[in-house]
Amino acid sequence: MIPIVLQTDFPNLKLVNKGKVRDIYDLGEHLLIVTSDRISAFDVVMNEGIPYKGFVLTQISKFWFDAFSDIVPHHLVSTEVDDFPAETRPYRDQLEGRSMLVRKAEPLPIECIVRGYLAGSGWKEYRQQGTVCGIALPPGMVESQKLPEPIFTPSTKAELGAHDENISFEKATELCGGDIAAQAREVALTIYGRARDEMAAKGIIVADTKFEFGLRDGRLMWIDEALTPDSSRFWPQDEYRQGGAQPSFDKQFLRDYLETLDWNKQAPAPTLPDDIVLKTSEKYLEALFRITGLKP
């Protein structure tokens, strides 16, 4: 079994960013992204690690980066520790299976979300205003209903512990420049369409997903993670029923459990029972197998 990694500690490497899930180290020409087994819900990081989570996210990202490299360049160089610079080798046990050596890029100041179904914050806004990120939708739609066509709904990038905010495409063009925003929208919609079709053949609905892009030498590059259970809503096709919330292959199971608690959704996080940790791990592993055919 792969060891659970909650924190990384690499004294001779330069830590440049510690996110809710990933630790990023600067290796000079490249970055090293280490995906821990931390899990967050409602923007609060839980105390417990989820077995295999970092492995699952890394392997799924590699699968999609490789699959769609014809659409847009991506930042992934290798997930094999043997390909990493020599100074990383002492930490092989913590890096194996959960790390990516990546090219550097300047991240865009927005997150690029594509929605194919009415769920989450999109459903909440639609109920109140009949729109999603200002995009008008037909009246009378219900929760989890398929949209007439996928829509691009960017958001801001919030600091750790804060909430992202949905923004209009016009605001995205102000933040990124019109040409870059338009290119990011086109690429995101293209990748989503391909992934939706490939996943449908595997019995999975991609309800929505979040992309991050950066610029390298002035060219758009796909960065961060790729169509993982942390950045996407994956629903089992055979259980899909519009008109309510759906079972999923992501951390929605954990969110649903936390909703049953008397917790204000602020730190400190409540203690997670062993069965909830195990069931969450099983959800991630099922997503890995359904998408890639891999088992750890």
UniProtKB/Swiss-Prot annotation:
It holds the Pfam family SAICAR_synt. Its EC number is 6.3.2.6. GO terms for biological process: 'de novo' IMP biosynthetic process. Gene3D superfamilies: ATP-grasp fold, B domain, Phosphorylase Kinase, domain 1. It catalyses: 5-amino-1-(5-phospho-D-ribosyl)imidazole-4-carboxylate + L-aspartate + ATP = (2S)-2-[5-amino-1-(5-phospho-beta-D-ribosyl)imidazole-4-carboxamido]succinate + ADP + phosphate + 2 H(+). Pathway: Purine metabolism; IMP biosynthesis via de novo pathway; 5-amino-1-(5-phospho-D-ribosyl)imidazole-4-carboxamide from 5-amino-1-(5-phospho-D-ribosyl)imidazole-4-carboxylate: step 1/2. One of its GO terms (cellular component) is cytoplasm. It comes from the Bacteria. Keywords: ATP-binding, Ligase, Nucleotide-binding, Purine biosynthesis. It is an enzyme of class 6 (ligase). This is Phosphoribosylaminoimidazole-succinocarboxamide synthase. It comes from Syntrophotalea carbinolica (strain DSM 2380 / NBRC 103641 / GraBd1) (Pelobacter carbinolicus).
